[in-house]
Design a protein with these regions (language model features):
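Auxiliary Fe-S-binding modules of radical SAM enzymes
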Residues: 53-57, 61-66, 79-169
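Short beta-strand/loop segments at the ligand-binding rim of alpha/beta enzyme cores
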Residues: 1-4, 62-68
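Active-site beta-loop-alpha junctions enriched in small/polar residues
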Residues: 2-6, 28-30, 72-76, 111-114, ...
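Core AdoMet radical
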Residues: 1-10, 15-54, 107
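Short, flexible active-site loops
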Residues: 35-41, 67-81
């Protein structure tokens, strides 16, 4: 349900009226600084801290493992953000740990830069980053007893995500 963090009263209404079984507010990136740079509209109209608060409130209503947040994995590697693959991986895993500890499940979609299509090393770096992130992230989900609920996203029906396939293995 939705990609935007909605006010608490609407979250509660969706639950009370049994309109949705799980909810997803797309934070997109981890870190307040990156959020402000990459998501200026979301930052201006909702704000990073309010986005996190909406996700936490949704966990209070829907329960642990029924609240998701889509994340764009690899956008941190764009030159303007000045991050190495190791730094980007560490940041993303820190975010995964933090969100999972709150009962929120991040869903990582691979960033696909249009400008990099003629730069094979860009795609190799992204592929390696994405593989490392997903392997380590599976360990984090396991640590918190979280699995992707099949009512939200199932094995073989994901777009550019690996979580369901890893969980199903």
């Amino acid at each position: 349900c939705g990609s935007g963090a909605i006010p608490n009263e609407y979250i509660l209404q969706l639950h009370k009226e049994n309109l949705v079984d799980a909810i997803c507010f797309n934070l997109e990136v981890w870190s307040e600084d990156l959020f402000a740079k990459i998501c200026p509209g979301k930052n201006k109209f909702v704000g990073y801290k309010n986005w996190i608060s909406a996700l936490e409130y949704a966990v209070d209503i829907f329960g642990k493992g029924k609240v998701y947040s889509a994340m764009v994995a690899g956008i941190e590697l764009e030159p303007e953000y000045k991050m190495t693959a190791e730094e980007a991986t560490e940041l993303a895993l820190h975010g995964a740990e933090d969100l999972c500890s709150r009962g929120i499940i991040p869903i990582y979609s691979l960033y696909w830069p249009v400008a990099g299509r003629n730069l094979p090393e860009t795609f190799t770096s992204l592929k390696n980053y994405f593989e490392t992130l997903n392997i380590e992230y599976a360990n984090i989900r396991s640590k918190y007893g979280l699995k992707i609920w099949e009512g939200f996203m199932c094995h073989r029906c994901a777009y550019m995500q690996l979580e369901c396939d890893i969980d199903n293995n």
